[in-house]
Amino acid sequence: MKSCARLVFCLYFFVPFGRAEEVGEWWGTAEREREYYRITEIPIPSPLVIEAGAFATLPDGRIAIGTRRGDLFLCSGIDHRKPSPKFELFATGLDEIFGLAFRDGAFYVTQSCELTRITDQNGDGRADKFETVSDGWGYANYHEYAFGSKFDPQGNLFVALGLSNSYHSRALFRGWAMKITPQGKTIPIASGL
């Protein structure tokens, strides 16, 4: 019990002050991690707040960032040698983006209540068309998050629907994983999440 309390204390007070590179050094995994991942600190200008929940890499090299606050930003200027990012607001007013994929000029955004296709129809760099791809599940509590995937080879997306209460929900399909086909058909595929 005493060592558990010490661990919680250390995690609470010291981990937030560390950097990702230092954690790898501390664990002795930094050299191995560098074979797979490059960690680059990206400065975010004040007063911009980005509580990132999902990312997608665009064909032109920009990064799309979906946020818990419901914004979708496009970020350019990310270079590991000298990052000088530029953040552009593409869409706002969404609900806790925890899934983001990009295909054929459209963003597929997983929100708590639906999977939405978002496009820029007039080419001004801002979203102007929002289409519901699937809303085949319920939503009853602000803690009932939905987590989306990238596309599989057949063009399907998957959504994991969290529960706000243990083992039951009043909302349809909470605690399930859903498969959404390219045609928008929603298929429950696994329960007990």
Language-model segments: which ranges?
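Beta-propeller blade termini and top-face loops
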Residues: 21-193
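N-terminal secretory signal peptides that target proteins for export/translocation
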Residues: 1-4
